[in-house]
C-alpha cells in the first residue's frame, strides 16, 4: 500500500512538473515570437526611415557629424573652361580693393601667368595686399617652373609670393603632403576653387593631347569664409605669419548675405583634407556620398585609381542597382595613368557600371553628381595621393540646378566618348592589359 501511495505521489508530482514545464515552454515560445516580431517591426521601421531620407539629406547629416559645416545662402557659378575661369578671375581682380589671396599647386611660367602677375602688380601699386602661395613640388614637376630669378621679379612687383615646403635634401621627406589646392579669395567676398592651376594649356590645350577640359567655380557668400580660413592656415604654416582680423571674414556675422535677385541660395560644404587635421575625411565623404545614392551616380576624374574604401562603395552601389556612370580620358599628361585607370574601370564595368572613354582631349575635371540632387567640384583626384596624402579641397554643393548643369555637360561629353564594352576590352592588346594590371599594383603611391 505504501509503495502504491508513493508511486501515486511520484506520478502526480511528475505530472505537475510536466505541466509546469509545458507552461514554461509556452511562455518561452511566446517570448521568442514577441521578440522576433519586435525586431522585424523595428527593421521595417528602419527600412522605411532609411528609404524616406533623401541622399542629399543623408550626406549633409554625415558631414555635420564629421564637423563640416553645411553653409546656406551662397551663390555658385560654374566655370567650365580655362577661358571662362581666367576671364572671370581677372575681371574680379581689377575690382579688388583690399587684398587678394592665391593658393595654387603651381604657377606655370607662361603667358597666362605673366598676365596674372602683371595685373597683380597693378593692384599692389594701388595698395591692395597680394599674397600668393604655391607648392614647391608642383612647381618643380611642371616643365615651365618659376625659378629664383622669376620669384625675385615677382616680389619686386610688390607681390608677397611664398613657396610651400621647399624641396631640400633628403628629397624623399618632401614627396608626400603636397599642397594640391587651387584657391583664390578677393576681399573676403568672392572665392574660386576647383581643378585648374595657372597655365596656358587650360586655354590652348597640349600637343599630342588636344583640348584640356577642366572645371572651376566661383563662390559668393558665407562659404568664402571657410576657404579664407584654409588659406590663412596654410599661409601661417608656410611663413609663420599669423593673420587675424574681422575684415578677412566679412560674411561671418552676415546671415542675410544679399544674393543676385535672379539666383537661388545654395547650400555648400567646404571639405578640406589636411594630412594631420583631417586625413580620412575626403575619402570618407566620397564613399558615403556614393553609398547614399538612391538612383544614379555620374563621375568624371582624370586619374581614376580609387582607394579601397571608394572602390568598395562603388561596387556596393552597383550591386544594389544604382546606375553608375564613369567617364575617364583615353589621353593623359602622366605616362601609364590611362592604363591603370582602364584596369580599374574594366573591373567596375564587369560589375555593371557604364564606363565612357573620353576622346576629345584630356578631361581633368574632378566632379561627381548624385541623384541629380547634389554634386562635388574640387581639386581631389580619386587616387591614393589625393585621398591619403595631399592637401585638397572640394565643395559639396547641395543644389539641383548646379548639379543638373554638370549632368547636362556629362551628357554632352558622352557624344565625344566611346562606351567600354567586353568587345572593346578583348581588342585591347595583352601588353596594355599587363601594363594596366602592373600599374594598378602601384596605386597605393600613385
Short names for language-model regions:
Residues 1-46:
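Bacterial Sec-dependent N-terminal signal peptides
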Residues 38-446:
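Charged, low-complexity intrinsically disordered terminal segments
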Amino acid at each position: 500500500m505504501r509503495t502504491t501511495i508513493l508511486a501515486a505521489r511520484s506520478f502526480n508530482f511528475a505530472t505537475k512538473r510536466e505541466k509546469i514545464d509545458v507552461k514554461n515552454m509556452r511562455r518561452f515560445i511566446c517570448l521568442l515570437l514577441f521578440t522576433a516580431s519586435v525586431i522585424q517591426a523595428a527593421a521595417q521601421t528602419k527600412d522605411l526611415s532609411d528609404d524616406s531620407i533623401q541622399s542629399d539629406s543623408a550626406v549633409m547629416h554625415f558631414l555635420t557629424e564629421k564637423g563640416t559645416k553645411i553653409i546656406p545662402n551662397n551663390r555658385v557659378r560654374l566655370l567650365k573652361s580655362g577661358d571662362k575661369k581666367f576671364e572671370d578671375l581677372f575681371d574680379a581682380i581689377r575690382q579688388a580693393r583690399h587684398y587678394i589671396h592665391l593658393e595654387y599647386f603651381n604657377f606655370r611660367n607662361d603667358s597666362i601667368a605673366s598676365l596674372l602677375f602683371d595685373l597683380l602688380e597693378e593692384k599692389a601699386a594701388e595698395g591692395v595686399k597680394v599674397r600668393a602661395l604655391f607648392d614647391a613640388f608642383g612647381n618643380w614637376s611642371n616643365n615651365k617652373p618659376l625659378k629664383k630669378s622669376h620669384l625675385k621679379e615677382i616680389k619686386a612687383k610688390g607681390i608677397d609670393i611664398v613657396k610651400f615646403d621647399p624641396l631640400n635634401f633628403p628629397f624623399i621627406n618632401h614627396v608626400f603632403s603636397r599642397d594640391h589646392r587651387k584657391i583664390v579669395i578677393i576681399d573676403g567676398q568672392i572665392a574660386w576653387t576647383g581643378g585648374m592651376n595657372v597655365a596656358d594649356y587650360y586655354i590652348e590645350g597640349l600637343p599630342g593631347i588636344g583640348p584640356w577640359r577642366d572645371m572651376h567655380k566661383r563662390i559668393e557668400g558665407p562659404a568664402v569664409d571657410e576657404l579664407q580660413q584654409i588659406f590663412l592656415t596654410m599661409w601661417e604654416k608656410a611663413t609663420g605669419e599669423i593673420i587675424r582680423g574681422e575684415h578677412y571674414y566679412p560674411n561671418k556675422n552676415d546671415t542675410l548675405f544679399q544674393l543676385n535677385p535672379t539666383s537661388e541660395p545654395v547650400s555648400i560644404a567646404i571639405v578640406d583634407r589636411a594630412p594631420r587635421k583631417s586625413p580620412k575625411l575626403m575619402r570618407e565623404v566620397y564613399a558615403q556620398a556614393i553609398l547614399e545614392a538612391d538612383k544614379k551616380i555620374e563621375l568624371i576624374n582624370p586619374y581614376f585609381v580609387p582607394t579601397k574604401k571608394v572602390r568598395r562603395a562603388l561596387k556596393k552601389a552597383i550591386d544594389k542597382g544604382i546606375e553608375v556612370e564613369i567617364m575617364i580620358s583615353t589621353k593623359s599628361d602622366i605616362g601609364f595613368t590611362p592604363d591603370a585607370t582602364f584596369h580599374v574601370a574594366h573591373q567596375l564595368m564587369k560589375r555593371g557600371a557604364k564606363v565612357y572613354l573620353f576622346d576629345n582631349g584630356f578631361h581633368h575635371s574632378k566632379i561627381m553628381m548624385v541623384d541629380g540632387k547634389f554634386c562635388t567640384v574640387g581639386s581631389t583626384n580619386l587616387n591614393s595621393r589625393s585621398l591619403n596624402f595631399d592637401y585638397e579641397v572640394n565643395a559639396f554643393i547641395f543644389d539641383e540646378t548646379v548639379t543638373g548643369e554638370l549632368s547636362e555637360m556629362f551628357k554632352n561629353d558622352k557624344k565625344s566618348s566611346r562606351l567600354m564594352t567586353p568587345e572593346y576590352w578583348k581588342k585591347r592588346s595583352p601588353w596594355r592589359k599587363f601594363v594596366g594590371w602592373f600599374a594598378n599594383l602601384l596605386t597605393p603611391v600613385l
